[in-house]
Amino acid sequence: MKLYIVRHGDPDYAADSLTERGRREAELLADKLEKMDFAAVYVSPLGRARETAEAYLRRLGRQGETKDWLREFAPTRFDPDLGHPTIMWDWLPQTWTAEKAFYDREGWMHVPVMEASGVPAEAEWVYDGLDELLARHGYEREGEIYRVLRPNRDSILFFCHFGVECVMLGHLLGISPMPLWHGTCALTTSVTTLVTEERREGIASFRMNSFGDVSHLIAFGQEPSFSARFCETWDCMEERHD
């Protein structure tokens, strides 16, 4: 079975919708996706993800199934460097890397700032929602592997957000989302692909075959959005520092 995880198009966060650029990205993505066969489509309830999904869904006259746990990862923390509450990722590297528990696949969510922000409950909600969905499609979580109840080659499509995508990937790959949040960037309308591997009958794991693919943008000369990235060098004042 294959999982395709899509981040929404270039966002207008204030309006929870897409920018004009984001709508163009979504149409280019739909050009790619409409050539593929998906057994099921799951969508975040947030507007920017729904608008991205709709560019694809309306072409096929089908509907996606909304899953609340696919919303952007919601807990916030107070960031002393910024002086106000912010998301649970985008820490300064010298801050988060100093806490070794952040690298632990289970310990990351139990660092005091995470506990105080309600991260464990939110993360478990995402984990449970994902596992319940995978069981519906024939793969049941058992410890660190998946029991194959119904082996299949279906393709499942998700429209969601970078933060929750990394939480999902951490669960499927057995790693903390912190290095994913801070060491990767799923650009807008990028596609991440995971595939089951059943090397022994009845026992499966997921392998990530590609991360953040934006070939559908590059092929048509669309420069990927800078959204979710930070400045390449300190002296580049045109790019985001915080």
Task: Give the location of each predicted region.
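Phosphate-coordination/substrate-recognition cap region in phosphate-metabolizing enzymes
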Residues: 30-110
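Glycine-rich N-terminal loop/short-helix segment of MobA-like nucleotidyltransferase
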Residues: 7-20
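Acidic, low-complexity terminal tails and accessory targeting/binding regions
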Residues: 73-90, 145-155, 167-242
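Short catalytic helix/loop segments, enriched in acidic residues and glycine
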Residues: 18-33
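Active-site metal-binding loops of divalent metal-dependent hydrolases
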Residues: 9, 162, 212-214
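Short, well-ordered beta-to-alpha junction loops that form the rim of enzyme active sites
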Residues: 45-46, 69, 151-163
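Extreme N-terminal starter segment of soluble prokaryotic enzymes
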Residues: 1-4
